[in-house]
Amino acid sequence: MKNNFRTVIGDEVIKSGYCLQSGIREYNQAYELQQHISLLRQQMLITDTVIFLEHYPCFTIGRHGGFNHILAGNEVLRDEGISIYETDRGGDITYHGPGQLVCYPIIDLKGYGRDVHRYARNIEEVVIRTMKKFSIDAGRREGYPGVWVGKEKIAAEGITVSRWVTMHGIALNVCPLLKH
């Protein structure tokens, strides 16, 4: 489903763009979609776009992660149907699965100050403000990315930027499969 949007990222308003609601997808399908939209955005053929979806169970390994950070054995992963993907985003390892809302903003930062760290903080701020609407006291932890409720991470963040256009984003645990 595609909708126009006008939203706030931190204290900044995204003037206009598209919101794609993509249902549940394999990670590699969503990654290919991100790459395609990012390329179109870099070429200024489309406006800023935000993709919302869920993934089938998988681990993604960012630039600072490694397979050795996966605690489950190959047999368990296979039996549970959990795939593993290496990615070009920042961060370590992240589990994705049903019950987790994933948001992939594909935004040209040239119109927003070209500050990647501020962008990352702004994405966290959107989640923090959203949690507040549900009376959940979420916040940041010094030295740790993402959004936290106490000592528990409720949203994992990992991004990459190419030609000032963002990819990847943030994954919010709404009602994830706790057995994973």
What name fits each language-model region?
Residues M1-V149, K153-I154:
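N-terminal lobe of the biotin/lipoate ligase/transferase fold
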Residues N68-G73, I154-K179:
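Short, conserved beta-strand/beta-arch hydrophobic-aromatic motifs that form part
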Residues G81-D92, H168-H180:
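Hydrophobic transmembrane alpha-helix bundles
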